[in-house]
């Protein structure tokens, strides 16, 4: 996701989260979930993502390697339960926003500590997890009585809504910004290259034929857009495309889940979200379009290296500054820290709280130079 400075049309984490909540609310309502729980999960799911998105996440993981690493989902949990100063404990320390178990659990996309889920310390759970060891106590409280390693249905809805939200709207952005000319997708060679790029990027088990069939299904719908010149009519057509595709996905998943689990309210661990294979293939295809026409062309741009360097610079200057530059809301934690590891976690929390714009401003102020990132 590009920052707003790149183009005013492009979405931010906030607008993306609002769109995810809209999708999640529709699907949750169709399945009889508690709307507040689903809404909370969808609106909160990206709180822990640092400046520069996944590129910044990789940089902070390097910075935090000696203290257990950095992961955006675990940072989200830390914000909700430790960092946000809405509720204080007896010692006056922040303990988050005081959410219920159900709401916190619905945010847990990867419901395990680092290395304690699928694949163990050397597997997937070492890369994707929902809590640091520092926060294990409150994580254990949240998961009390929950099946080990299993996500509640509200978390599954949040995760799918996230996929739907960014896959559909990234395609919308690519077309509106001129990165993708829909007319090029009438060329069979171009489509073949798109399918291969999708499979290469996501490492999917789906064959090119499976993805090709998904493309044919979507491109065969009357609302599919075949050209775009920025006119009012085309802009309306593009907006209608996003609405129709989102509705298609929500209806397919709701129908399949209802066929399996019946018509009663489906909450917590009473059901698993059922995603038809064709729907999963169509979602992956749209994600592949975003990869092919937005992510791949930017993947090796010098800006990515500059972003990581900026984060490394900030970590160094904050760590060696004796608390100088740390926000007042985190300064008490810094002064209470008993060792450098604890202070480094404060520095990571601080950098993760910044936006792209504020990270550049902090770098210019603290590192004594103007950032061109």
Give the ranges of each region predicted by the language model.
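Glycine- and acidic
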Residues: 3-9, 41, 147, 227-232, ...
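Alpha-helical phosphate/pyrophosphate-handling elements in metalloenzyme active cores
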Residues: 6-37
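Hydrophobic (often cysteine-bearing) scaffold residues that line and stabilize catalytic clefts
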Residues: 16, 52, 56, 72, ...
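Sequence-structural signature of the catalytic-core scaffold of metal-dependent phosphohydrolases
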Residues: 22-25, 30, 47-237
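Short alpha-helical catalytic segment bearing the HExxH-like zincin motif
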Residues: 38-43, 159
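C-terminal subdomains that position terminal phosphate/3'-OH groups for nucleotidyl transfer/ligation
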Residues: 199-338, 342, 354
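Short, amphipathic C-terminal "tail helix"
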Residues: 339-372
């Amino acid at each position: 996701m590009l920052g707003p400075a790149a183009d005013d049309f492009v979405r931010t984490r906030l607008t993306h989260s609002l769109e995810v909540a809209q999708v999640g609310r529709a699907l949750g309502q169709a399945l009889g979930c508690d709307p507040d729980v689903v809404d909370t999960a969808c609106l909160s799911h990206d709180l822990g993502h640092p400046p520069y998105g996944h590129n910044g996440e990789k940089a902070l993981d390097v910075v935090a390697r000696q203290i257990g690493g950095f992961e955006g989902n675990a940072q989200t949990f830390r914000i909700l339960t430790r960092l946000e100063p809405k509720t204080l404990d007896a010692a006056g320390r922040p303990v988050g926003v005081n959410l219920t178990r159900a709401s916190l659990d619905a945010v847990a996309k990867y419901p395990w500590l680092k290395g304690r889920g699928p694949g163990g310390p050397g597997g997937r759970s070492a890369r994707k997890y929902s809590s640091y060891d520092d926060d294990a106590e409150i994580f254990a409280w949240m998961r009390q009585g929950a099946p080990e390693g299993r996500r509640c249905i509200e978390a599954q809805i949040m995760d799918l809504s996230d996929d739907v939200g960014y896959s559909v709207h990234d395609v919308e952005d690519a077309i509106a910004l001129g990165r993708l000319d829909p007319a090029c997708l009438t060329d069979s060679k171009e489509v073949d290259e798109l399918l291969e790029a999708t499979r290469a990027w996501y490492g999917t088990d789906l064959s090119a034929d499976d993805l090709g069939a998904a493309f044919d299904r979507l491109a065969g719908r009357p609302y599919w857009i075949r050209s775009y010149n920025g006119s009012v009519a085309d802009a309306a057509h593009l907006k209608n495309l996003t609405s129709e595709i989102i509705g298609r996905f929500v209806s397919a998943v709701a129908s399949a889940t209802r066929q399996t689990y019946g018509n009663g309210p489906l909450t917590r661990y009473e059901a698993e979200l059922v995603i038809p294979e064709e729907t999963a293939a169509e979602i992956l295809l749209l994600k592949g379009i975003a990869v092919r026409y937005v992510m791949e062309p930017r993947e090796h741009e010098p800006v990515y290296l500059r972003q990581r360097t900026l984060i490394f610079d900030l970590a160094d200057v904050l760590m060696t500054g004796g608390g100088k530059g740390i926000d007042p809301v985190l300064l008490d934690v810094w002064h209470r820290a008993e060792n450098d590891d604890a202070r480094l976690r404060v520095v990571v929390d601080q950098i993760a709280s910044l936006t792209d714009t504020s990270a550049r401003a902090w770098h210019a102020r603290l590192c004594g130079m103007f950032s061109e990132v």
